[in-house]
Structure formats: C-alpha cells, structure tokens
Amino acid sequence: MKQRLIQYFTQNRERIAADIVRLMSAFVAERTINVISERLADYPFLKCRGEEYRVAELVKQEFRRFGIRFTEYARRPERPNVVGTVGRDEAGTRLLLAAHMDIVPAGDGWTTDPYHVTIRDGIAYGRGVLDNKGPLAAIIVAGGILTELFGDRPMAGQLLIAALADEEVTDPDGIDYGIEYLLTERLIRPSHAIIPDIGGDMRQIDVAEKGQAVIRITAQGRQAHGSTPEQGINAIYRMASLVRELERLVLDYTPHAVLGIPTLNLGEIHGGAAPNIVPGECTIHLDIRTVPGLTRQSLEHQLQKCLVQVDGSFRMETISWSEPHQLDPDNEVVRAIQNNSLNLLGFRPEPFGMGGGTFAKTLNLAGIAAVGWGPGSENAFHVTDEWMEIRQLVDFALLICLISWDLLT
C-alpha cells in the first residue's frame, strides 16, 4: 500500500503540486493577521484579531471536495478551528496534524505583494507560505489523497487534520481561541501529533522547547511641561537606567543538555506623549525563554532584585508564562518520520530542542506525544519575502501519507 502511495505521487506530482499551490494561494490572499488587542486599531480592515474564519471557510470547502468529514469548533464565530478526520478510530491511536491559519503582519520592504503568492524558480513567496498556510495546504491535500485512494477502510486509527486559530500571539486578556481551547474543552483527544511549524527543511525534529515569559515593566515618573523638566520626573530616563541593569543581568540557572541556556530580549519600549512633555510613564516588554529548572517564582524574584538596583518606582507584571518541555526522542512518531524520510529523501531527521514556541509544547504539556517537523527554512519565518520551496511541500505531503499509514494501520 505504501508503494502505491509513492507510485501515485510519482505519476501525479505536477497535479499535486498545483493543488497545493492553488490552496496555499487562496489561504495567503486572506489577511488573517493576529496582533494583541491594543494594536488592532493599526489594521482597520480587521474587526477582531485573526479573523481566521476567512481561511476556515476555504478549508471546509476543500474538505467537502475531498470527502473528508469535519467539525468546526469556535469559542468566537470569527475565530474558528476546523478539524477533519480520516480513518475508523477503532485502534485508539489518533494522529493530529495541526497548522495555524493566523499570520503575523507583513511589515515593510517586500519585493512582491505579501498577500499574493508569487512563484519564481520553484519557490513561493508570500506572507504565510511557510508560517503556516503552505504546510496547512499540504496536510489537507495529503488527507485528500489518503481518502481518494483508500477511504477509511485500511486505517483503524484516525488522522485528525486541524486548521487552528490563535497561534501567533498571546493576548493580555489571556483568552485562547486555538489549541488550548480545544484541549481544555476536550473537543479533540489525539494520542500523537505532528506540528509542521519549525522549518529545518524536514531535517530536524523538535522534541523540546524552551518556556516563555512575557514581562511588562512600567517606570513611573511625574509629568511636567517640557520647558520646566526640573518640576517633573522623566520616566524615560528612569527606564534607561533600568535597561542598563537588564543588559548586565545574568540569570541564575542550570544549563540544559538539549535546550541550553535561557535568553532575554527587550523587544518593545513605549513612553512619552509629545516632545514638550516630561513623560510620566515608560513601559518595556521583555521576552524571556526559559529552560527546565528556572521557575516563574525564581525568574520574577531575579527581575525584582534588578528593579531595586535602580532609584525609582517601577511596576512589573508577568503577561504570559509557559513551561518548557522535553519529549523522549525514542518514540514511534520520531521513528516513523526518520524511517520514511531516509527511505524517500535519503536523510534521517535528527531530534533537537528550540527556543521558539509551537503547538507541540502545548500538546506535550497536556500529555500528548507531539513533535515539531515540517518543510521550509527556519530563516524564512516572519521575514520580508517569506519563502517556501514547492518541492518540499509535495515531499512533505507524501511523507505525511506514509507516516500516517505506519502509525494508523
């Protein structure tokens, strides 16, 4: 049966590539931009964050075309998740393939229209072709081919093909519309998962991810007229002193064998209303990636010690927190990926740990054996002229079919 799949892809490769590109292009044309609520006004065409329903409608249309059963789950109508199912679900093994429908803003400097897929020399350019609309198109087409060739008959297990909402940012309101919503409400119950959202050109398998803390620190001063700065307290100057302390901060931690060391990035700073006003507040946001052993309590304590080194008044809040995780790389999902990749492409993807966060972490922390693995370059995420090799998307679709066959029949 696996040989039949390989033969089918060999004979129909151009048509399969065209199918993936057609679907990916339709997804990319929908500007499903996800930003935190306070930035929503920068995107007047959005009525809410994400608006993943725009892509979800296309996903449902495609599932109907392929004859794939599906269910829509939505905490909010504009932000749905669509889960298609293939297989009889009699074996207790459920493999989740999950890709997200939301994207980050395009930003500036593109040489192509970011919301229109441009193809040059076998490479597709556009916002989302890698993260994550290209892989989403590939897993849908893979599910369609399995259904076309075999129906549900040979697969005693079940393949879940999920188009998910709300991956790119965590809003300060703490409400999740994607994978955490589905797991908390027990709407899906996979035993294993593959998340195609790490890059690595299919040569790496993400089995460990750092934790993430997003910290907001506000320096409090006293507003005054710009011509009499001595009557105020300049919150930006106060924050500048703290930034120097943060640059010198050495976190107390134990290096991890796979994940290495924690990192701290000062990613945002906001302060002041006008040049002729002494600013009364200045705020920064820190992104800290943690390793096992560095607890939330310990991190917050170390940052508080840093604050007291600076003369002034500060307010610190932990906006979001997620734990690190590590999955034993000796498991059947990793073996299925490695064996099929070696047989088809001639290389054996290797397990590794990463600092970025994917749905794999959320799933693993919920007790589901999930790995990150997929097509595309890790250097193409969130960049100008985001790109994806079409060849990789087709190879990935075939590998998904072969891996699903190994795990579910």
Q: Which residues make up each language-model segment?
A:
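Glycine/serine-rich anion-binding loops at beta->alpha junctions
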Residues: 123-137, 225
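Metal-dependent amide/peptide-bond hydrolase catalytic core
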Residues: 1-15, 54, 71-76, 105, ...
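Acidic/histidine-rich catalytic neighborhood of metal-dependent amide-processing enzymes
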Residues: 132-208, 408-409
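A structural signal for isolated positions on well-ordered beta-strands in alpha/beta enzyme cores
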Residues: 71, 96, 160-162, 315
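Structural motif
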Residues: 93-95, 123, 160, 191-193, ...
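Short beta-strand segments
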Residues: 98-99, 162-164, 193-197, 218-220, ...
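Acidic/His- and Gly-rich active-site-bordering loop/insert found
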Residues: 2-124, 148-155
